[in-house]
Regions:
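Nucleic-acid-interacting cores, centered on viral/eukaryotic replication and modification enzymes
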Residues: 1-198
Length: 198
């Protein structure tokens, strides 16, 4: 319930910050538990075996994008951080261009809702799952200044920063500098080992 509450509150804030005033949320039965917490919005809850068609279609599109991306990568298993970021990557990719059935022919859904200008393709120039060496800071010792990582997703900021998964720890990193390299069998094995260990 706390997760749904936090998500609804964050979404309402995002819309209101852009000058939109949501009056209705169409949802399934899981939202019954939180609808009384949001008095200023009407929750239209569908019946037990029913779904909101627009939401189901959007979910199906994200799943298809995720599935296609997974089948284009050489990994047999993916760590949780890669799966989470892949869903975000799919959603962001879908929403970065105007939709043919959308409210605008020139503005993307992302631009309409967030106010950010259309994402510059230069910030999306790194394919999900690419092996890279990321810059890991400067020091006066002889330790390596780069770290092996797997590209996850653009952060969406104007600097072109990206999120990566560290091959050393499996944790998500936020970096501005990287060097793409050919994907080695060792990197593939390491990604799968991180996934197996979770």
């Amino acid at each position: 319930t706390a997760t749904i509450t936090d998500c609804v509150a964050a979404d309402l804030k995002l819309y209101r910050d852009r000058g939109f005033e949501p009056t209705e949320i169409q949802a399934d039965g899981e939202y019954n538990a939180v609808k009384t917490l949001f008095k200023d919005v009407h929750f239209s809850i569908c019946s037990a075996d029913d779904h909101v068609p627009e939401a189901e279609r959007a979910i199906r599109t994200v799943k298809e994008t995720v599935r296609a991306t997974i089948h284009g990568m050489p990994y047999k298993r993916l760590p949780r951080v890669m799966v989470r970021e892949l869903v975000t990557f799919a959603e962001r990719s879908i929403n970065m261009l105007p939709h043919s059935d959308g409210v605008s022919d020139t503005m993307s859904p992302d631009t309409i809702v967030t106010g950010r200008p259309r994402m510059d393709y230069r910030t999306m120039n790194l394919e999900f799952g690419t092996y890279v060496q990321v810059y890991d800071g400067t020091s006066n010792d002889v330790k390596s200044r780069t770290l092996g990582a797997i590209a996850l997703n653009s952060t969406g900021n104007a600097n072109g920063d990206h999120y990566f998964m560290s091959l050393a720890t499996g944790e998500r990193l936020h970096r501005r500098s990287w060097m793409p390299l050919p994907l080695s069998d060792l990197a593939i094995t390491r990604v799968e080992a991180i996934a197996t260990k979770e």
